[in-house]
């Protein structure tokens, strides 16, 4: 420190001596440096000395210069010193100051037309912030920015995105202008990252002590979690002190990951920062190209650089600042521009300019000199130095260095990648050492049983449970690749985790927060609330909300045979049968047909109805209809019956083989609009919180989620919600309920249900994903995420998905119809109604038969005796009449009533053969004959009533016409009987004798 004032005085004297000694030089430049930029002045003088010794550039001309120092925060002083330099006459002005004074010098240079080469400098090595110099659109800006623009915010954003950080804290020192990362803060806020800011005071020890004194234990623990991810924007000296303090006070552990970003970090600073830190450290700094050939490190084209600046082993070169390098390259650039002007013989002499005089004119050669400088370019210590159209240097490169996770101090550091504005990030930031060193590591894994993500595959008493599922397959893939082992257990409360009133977490997330587990895996969705307390890998499967509903069951309709026609149509058909039967009877009654030989049926109303019904069911009828009107009626009826029966047959076949039972709920909107089926989800789950936040949003008051929340929140959520997913699935299967849950879980349940009784609906928008949860700041997250991405890229993840969610499962996921129903075979349920109708007919017929039997027995008890009710023995009468007809004088013979033997006849019983023949029914007729019986006998005649013949089962025939009988004449001919009296022969049934008609083929009658 005692030598420094002497050197300063010596340098000022040397500067004045140089100026006076070269007063006749035509090349003179001025320099303004910050008071703290002593190295800039030293490097500036070294650069001028190197160029004056190089005869190939300026040949016989020498560069002279004037240097002055100003307060970086005093713009007035900077302008005053610049005016003094312009008054001396300069070709260009070089400045290494802060942004405050740079703006004033920019205005002065523009006014006086003096090229101004500005090297931005920050205080004490603190990272730069953008100066924001105003650029004119008229291309009359005489200020050129030698240092590239500030790209720190772009580099930080790229690195943070690569590391997939979601929550971190930024520490910055008191000298840093926080506005320098305002653009970065805006971008991370748009991406949903949680970023905290904290200013680091100069007295770091006092700041740390204050934290311990003012924070409670819970707050201090949360602060420790925050420090696991941190970005340090401060000068190297402050960063070293801060890291030392937090490590010694145990505020950070080996699982922390810090990023230090500063352009001014040199190799010595890197080694010191790595030595003091624990955990993982990433360093971002500006880097410059170095020739691979050691012998060429100090040569740039035809110019040789002083070895004190280019030799990496030189102590001065090791501690140079970024601004020192740009100072040297600026002098080299000016020397080449002067050389160009001398060669082109377009030299403009220097002019003494006065800033004080009102009518002072700018330098006439300023524009030409500025264009020569802008078009030129050199290769120096910083690489290629050139200017773009906007007057800035676009060439910049950043180097990203990093260490591996570890507790030991003094770990090695390696280059992870590099960044530039053109190509972006080149390289991988993955911790390769961590990937290779997980062999033998045993991780404790917490899970929640959820099909098909995690399921118990084997549970043997006395042995650890074995698990299977999609998440277990993913975990095994990571384990096989990285080489770690794991022990798995189920969360004590079987929950995924939600925040409690006291700020703690329960469930799977709570196990990670309290550090009882290293990894949490199941059907765990990535949510902002969970990301605040734990870290997540990249998603390994997309997530969406679905609804599980019970497929509508096929109802057992015993009378499915009646389904093809509507009830009203059946009523019309039944009425039509009655109406047509009545019309047929009336038509035959109005115009009775002639009696046909051999026909023994009559057209009663009963027979007409029976005939119409028989023809309708295609069974035919017994009554012949010969009238034209009746036949036209029956023709129309048969056509009607043909169409109806054909339509019924076709419709019945289609109805019994294909049954469609479609549900009215096919989307979440349909579910929210109805109230017949209650629905809910798992209490305090991610789905529950998602619906709650959406439903309580005032901007979505009438939306789908608000309607869903009203249903889910009934009775404070206890009415329609369940405590775990399996309870919700069982509630759907055995009740009227819809379960809202993860679509992947519900699809697996629907696919593998033995009865195929479920179907799912849902939202296909994958706004979230399933991820592996780790402790906040876990060193394993990055390598896990990298491996998951590799599994997705090579298709292994899709293979695992198809294993648990096959495309062609045994059940249809989205159809509310039972697709397992066969279309060809009909079961007993489909025809149960037909058997019921048959059974009803049998029961009814048996009941009627019993009634008839009872009625006949009751009627038989009241039949009169033989003495009171006798009938004529028709066979005896037949023989007597035949004998009379063969007598010659029978026509004139008189006989008395007593000559006729009235013998009771029993016609109740008939021989078997006789019963099989068609026998006329005389119940509604009587036999009228013309006979020769004397009129005295006719008084005994009476009509054969239906009552008398009730036991004689004859068919119905038309009534015989009354007329005279013919009898055989003695000569064998026939003649009309002289007695033409018409009389009736009465008869009554007798229960004792049978009547044998037609057994004797030789028997005949003339009646």
Swiss-Prot record:
One of the record's GO cellular component terms: plasma membrane
Acetylation recorded as keyword: no
Chain positions covered by the region annotation Interaction with AP4M1: 921-991
Residue ranges that the UniProt entry lists as topological domain Cytoplasmic: 588-635, 852-1007
Region (Interaction with CBLN1 homotrimer): 24-345
Secretion signal span: 1-23
Binding site for Ca(2+) 2: 753, 755, 757
Segments crossing the lipid bilayer: 567-587, 636-656, 831-851
Disease: Spinocerebellar ataxia, autosomal recessive, 18: A form of spinocerebellar ataxia, a clinically and genetically heterogeneous group of cerebellar disorders. Patients show progressive incoordination of gait and often poor coordination of hands, speech and eye movements, due to degeneration of the cerebellum with variable involvement of the brainstem and spinal cord. SCAR18 features include progressive cerebellar atrophy, delayed psychomotor development, severely impaired gait, ocular movement abnormalities, and intellectual disability.
PANTHER family xrefs: IONOTROPIC GLUTAMATE RECEPTOR
Record protein name field: Glutamate receptor ionotropic, delta-2
Organism field: Homo sapiens (Human)
